[in-house]
């Protein structure tokens, strides 16, 4: 059996208090603050506690030149090697590690900056249900947060408290201001209405549709859309989750931005889509009546083709999605539709539904849009105290 270390690995000395049943049973406080070494690897789902002996073995075993199992046992001991094989920090050529080797190969093939790869891989949510937590009283209200943590930092941030300010001229008021004033996050969608084919097509093209291309070199094409993107690569994909849309069956569709067309991936019943969409937005039940959601994913292999192991590239992913989200909001406001964006998503459920390969393509955020209810039943930012600039 041939063995090698995983491609990327980082360790942390963790001394955060954690629940310890042994402490509780022995009359202690139930917390353990003993420092422990935790190993993080992007091909794994969670950090692994390791001993100093296991760290020594990981230091000495190559990630590129496999070694014989028996040779490593003689050098580091059977218990150490088997423990590292069992937790996936060491990879072998047997069938039991096929999936882990495939994930590790993606880490090799896609030029991730290691800290970003670990943050992306291990920051993913699984089976989070915010609605259920609300029902059980596990979510803190604003008042409870103030009581527990003190007042939030003030919304106006000044660097010099007593310095004189420089007055600016009154801003122009054009037709664009009216659209901006209508931009808001909607939590009240009308479950009896569908989104029209025209509105859906307009939203998809305005936000994610390609306007033109420019060949920078053979094999390197930049894309122009209505929002900016790092390097002109536009590595964000749009997957449309349809619950109620004119002319479309409920299901999952991939938007082909260069063709302005939908690629059907899976067809479901309306109830199945409602349940899937609820899981995808982590149980935020105030969004479940929206007729369509769009999952925005990042194609890391495309973006990192240019920005290889770049310390800033992962930030660009989130900037791109932010630009698209604002374009979505403004387009929805123009069409008189409600809209939202959320990054509180169950990554695992999305990856399974869309068939994504972790770290090659990953979900970043979900947006949704459609007809609003005439009267709010869930809190939105209405009744604002408007600022007077006169």
Residues covered by each model-derived region:
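Short Gly/Pro-enriched loop/turn and capping motifs at secondary-structure junctions
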Residues: 299-303, 346-348, 372-374
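Short, surface-exposed loop/helix-turn segments at secondary-structure junctions
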Residues: 274-275, 308-315
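Small-aliphatic-rich amphipathic alpha-helix that forms the alpha element of a beta-alpha
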Residues: 203, 238, 294, 313-350
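Anion (oxyanion) recognition and catalysis
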Residues: 85, 288, 333
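N-terminal accessory segments that position/regulate proteins before the catalytic core
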Residues: 1-284, 293, 353, 362-364, ...
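Active-site-adjacent "gating/activation" loops or surface patches in catalytic cores
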Residues: 285-290, 295-311
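C-terminal structured interaction module
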Residues: 326, 340-343, 358-362, 367
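Short alpha-helix boundary/capping segments
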Residues: 195, 282, 286, 312-320
